[in-house]
């Protein structure tokens, strides 16, 4: 069974409630129909009922009736949620009038439904910007305990089966935090290992903190940051298998790892790679994807207390369908 099939199977094993606040968008509705047909999640759609039903009819979607459909303009819990939102944002000066308007916004409404235990995760981005997706999540759901930094993890599936877990690697940050400091980088490492377990199904994440230096082979403040981040990650998660700083070849190739970092538990065996900054991460994964013909799945947002994921506006129905399954796996993990 390939990785995506494994993720779908895990989602089916313990169905989660996933909010799709862009229900009037064609690809989103088609993905919802497929998810409902395959029984991988309980779907909550937010949108104008007449528009959603007309689109479903136009596209011949047979399963949308199984979803919970919420009209943001006429939701019977809107006032209750507005009062709770005003309380959450009271320190920022939000009034009840402002809160009432915000809960008509499907992205805010979805996050409030999650906050009040009515759902387990949310996916948007087919129409919305990353900022619009993240803003309500950070204002309402907030970060996991002990985490202040949101990041974007990615599943990389390579044809080179000798690397990672049978060719599967989990890498970060590729999407969110441009120049993490040592503390933020340590959080990214811990969250990426967590995602590797929850989504990729790794029994034992082995985290390499990447740099252009291996174990002091070069001296620079950016290497020092990676070394400090490794130390902080070990403090935050004492059972986590992690090492750094390591060059990419030392992290992935056993013979190189043995020469450059003798005695390391991670060198040559890494299945999770943490980049020193977003620039390196984003460029690096896209080069592997294009030049190495690898499959890239994600980014998957990490560090939020309940999963909220962001799609590319160029996403396909398949992308959304698999993100529903990924978000469900994250939601299961968040409840542990």
Annotated model-derived regions:
Residues 1-267, 272-336:
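Anion-binding alpha/beta catalytic cores of soluble intermediary-metabolism enzymes, centered on
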């Amino acid at each position: 069974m390939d990785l995506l099939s494994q993720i779908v199977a895990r989602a089916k094993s313990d169905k989660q409630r996933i909010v799709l606040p862009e229900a009037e968008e064609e690809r989103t509705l088609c993905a919802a129909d497929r998810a409902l047909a395959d029984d991988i999640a309980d779907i909550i759609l937010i949108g104008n009922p007449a528009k959603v039903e007309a689109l479903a009819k136009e596209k011949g979607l047979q399963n949308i009736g199984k979803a919970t459909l919420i009209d943001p303009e006429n939701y019977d819990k809107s006032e209750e949620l507005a009062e709770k939102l005003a309380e959450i944002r009271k320190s920022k000066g939000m009034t009840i009038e402002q809160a009432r308007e915000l809960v008509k916004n499907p992205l805010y409404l979805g996050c409030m439904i999650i906050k009040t235990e009515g759902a387990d995760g949310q996916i948007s981005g087919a129409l919305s910007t990353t900022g619009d997706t993240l803003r309500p999540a950070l204002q309402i759901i907030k970060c996991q305990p002990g985490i202040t930094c949101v990041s974007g993890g990615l599943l990389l599936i390579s044809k080179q089966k000798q690397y990672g877990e049978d060719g599967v690697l989990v890498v970060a940050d590729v999407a969110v935090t441009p120049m993490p400091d040592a503390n933020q980088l340590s959080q990214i490492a811990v969250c990426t290992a967590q995602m590797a377990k929850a989504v990729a199904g790794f029994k034992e994440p082995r985290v390499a903190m990447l740099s252009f230096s291996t174990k002091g082979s070069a001296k620079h403040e950016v290497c020092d940051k990676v070394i400090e981040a490794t130390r902080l990650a070990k403090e935050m998660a004492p059972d986590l298998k992690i090492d750094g700083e390591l060059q990419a070849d030392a992290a992935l190739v056993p013979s190189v790892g043995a020469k450059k970092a003798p005695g390391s538990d991670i060198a040559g065996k890494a299945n999770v790679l943490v980049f020193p900054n977003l620039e390196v991460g984003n460029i690096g994964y896209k080069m592997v994807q294009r030049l190495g013909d690898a499959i890239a799945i994600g980014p998957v947002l990490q560090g939020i207390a309940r999963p909220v994921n962001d799609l590319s506006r160029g996403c396909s129905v398949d992308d959304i369908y698999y993100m529903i399954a990924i978000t469900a796996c994250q939601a299961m993990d968040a409840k542990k």
